[in-house]
């Protein structure tokens, strides 16, 4: 993801109305223990780079570095993120923003000591134009009373049982949340931004592939959850009503390549979107009489204006660019352009940890568990 971020900076000329332009001045990775190709990719493509470090302390000591993007395995989140904040750097971190709830709380405590710093978490899917349209509808309460919300992130990267193990399949590096920690913030972003709060959860978690090749001729145990389905009672929306909220995070989803989806059903309107067809937004607006689903083709109808014509398709790299535009815009102006054109906040990551911690307990007890933040 570091290279995805760097590539977004290289495309900054696509954003004609931004109040600031970021410059890549330093990179840090295990360059001393990796082939030179990675370091060379950065330095050859970004002549602005002044520092290529193998020790993150060296990068954080660089006075020319104002903000950092930190994408490391989950067990390093607390150490790296807190160090970045202590060094006075604005931070874009990765989900789950701490390997567990204590780690997340430590990061938030560090952030609270530095209110002058912008601290956000990566989540790009809400920047697809169709989801921005849905966000606008949520803002103006176009759905009316919320009846039901279904959302999820499904892919098949672990469908092959012979795929070698990596850190995301090892609990000591990924954490007990498993697929929830890796994928869940993507699923929670829109509901949490909408103000919809889970009151309780009944979780069904699945460990499907129990061991994988270790890359050394043997087998290694997989102790993380492959798939998770969370059934929640949530409250929010017009009138603060209670409604069912179902969230799915799956690494083993046959037939799915990398599918993020959102479905909202309301008394006045309903909407459906899936990245399986990233152009299509399905809408049902009901004012009495017959019901009719519309299919709208979305183009470059983005939160942050681009030079690309409005009729052309939007893709994953465009979502990454829009997410970084949101971060830079907020850093430069001190505010979000609009509620759903903003990155995940530390407080929203805390809500996700409350949900996932309760989900682990729910699965262990095979019971509905009340969410801590629900009181």
Give, region by region, the residue ranges found by the protein language model.
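Terminal low-complexity tails and localization/encapsulation signals of metabolic enzymes
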Residues: 1, 295-313, 326-330, 361-375
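N-terminal glycine-/serine-/threonine-rich beta1-alpha1-beta2 phosphate-ribose binding loop
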Residues: 1-89, 105, 109-116, 336
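Glycine- and charged-residue-rich phosphate/anionic-cofactor binding loop of Rossmann-like
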Residues: 21-25, 122, 333-351
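Hydrophobic residues in well-ordered beta-strands that form the structural core
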Residues: 93, 99, 119-121, 150, ...
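Conserved PLP phosphate-binding loop immediately N-terminal to the Schiff-base lysine helix
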Residues: 97-106, 127-129
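Predominantly a Rossmann-like dinucleotide-binding segment in NAD(P)-dependent oxidoreductases
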Residues: 117, 125-223, 228, 281, ...
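Mobile, glycine-enriched helix-loop/loop "lid" segments at the mouths of ligand-binding/catalytic clefts
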Residues: 150-153, 277-303
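Contiguous beta-strand/loop segments that form the cofactor/metal-binding neighborhood of enzyme cores
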Residues: 182-287, 313, 319-336, 356-360, ...
